[in-house]
Amino acid sequence: MPSSLAILVSKCTIFPDQKSHVETLKLSVSDIPMLSCQYIQKGVLLTAPPFSFQDLVVFLQQSLSTTLSCFPPLAGRLITDPDGHVHIDCNGAGIDFLVVKSPTLSVNDILCPGDVPGCVKEFFTFDKTLSYSGHFKPLAAVQVTELADGVFIGCSVNHAVTDGTSFWHFFNTFAEITRGASKISKNPDFCRQTVFNSQAVLKFPTGGPTVTFSGDEPLRERIFHFSREAILKLKYRANYGCLLTKQTNSEIVGKLSNDNWKSVNSNTEISSFQSLCAQLWRSVTRARKLEPTKTTTFRMAVNCRHRLDPKLNPYYFGNAIQSIPNIAPASELLANDLSWGANLLHKSVMAHDNETVLGGVEDWERQPRLFPLGNADGASITMGSSPRFPMYNNDLGWGKPLAVRSGRANKFDGKISAFPGREEDGSVDLEVVLAPETMAGLENDAEIMQYVSQVELVN
């Protein structure tokens, strides 16, 4: 792979093209714990547009200005009132917009098999920036990088301001306006009269919180692609593993050919994604060579918008997530079949209803605290993002993205991010970050690698 030569061409501030109708938004019980998390960094790889890069930059700047008028909190700054409550001041201070050129990099350099190339981290700004820094830094930034034969658009957003659902809502709207839409199709909901609104105060030391993981340990990062067929096989194993030896692979896929992995038909059925997560939990635990009695943890984030009664607006803007830790001794997880671990995950997700969400809010109010991101005991996995997110809806006018990639933010041994496959047929890409020796073990784990397939390069 050629060396990455990133040249900063320009940097400016993009302001909303209209004055905000929203003045301030108070951070919620779900927002505040994220102040110690780094900015979300996600972006899309695109083919070169059918017009000049200079024209693209102008189009993006104009559409971003319009988009910010639809999402005024992102153009603001954080403020803390005398009582210690943190708010978003929707003051229209603007966001950063960077133009970068990397003429030696090609699209296939980014899509190459094996580890994610380090140059991808250069496609984002606000590297290692904690969300608390939104008190004095922009709450978002967009970086446009011109490659030899393509474009990468990287977006960095304060994690105390958005979760993944709101992040991709913003990105999709940005793409929609860039395509020429005169009116956006999905308006964000800035209502703060929800169960997450609280009078509890989390006190911060002078200068704000520190990151909850070291970030200095050696890591490897790789994208593992799971086709729709592989996902269906995993789901079948998790639900009907005892019957698996009696049927051929083609029969299994045929049996589940009408499966929609996004919608589980029964509360008793383990979903496709839960099946995939359970397989990853098993294989990473085996690759870590833990003591049999060591307690392993698989932490999942759940979207609470539809779990509340009454439900939140699907386009509620902000964080509306809670974390579910699932624990199991290493020996039990590995001694049992896939369905055992998958059933643990399934039961915890199904149990996370309105009452559980409210209980989580009350628990936080009794003991306000930051989100414990990291892997302190060496036996944890944290699953972030979601293959449900509409990442490939970011067509800016000349075709959907070739791939989705993320920056350096919030990565540590055991951090996994789930993306939809580009096929958008139920396939999944897992962005896996592990210690080098664990990654080597995972790559040699036949149980999971039988389901992994290569993504073809661009011709």
Region locations from a protein language model:
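Low-complexity, glycine/alanine/valine/leucine- and proline-rich hydrophobic stretches
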Residues: 376-458
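Soluble acyl-CoA-dependent acyltransferase catalytic core bearing the H(X)4D motif
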Residues: 2-24, 36-391
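Short, surface-exposed beta-strand/loop micro-motifs that present aromatic residues
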Residues: 33, 139-145, 413-421
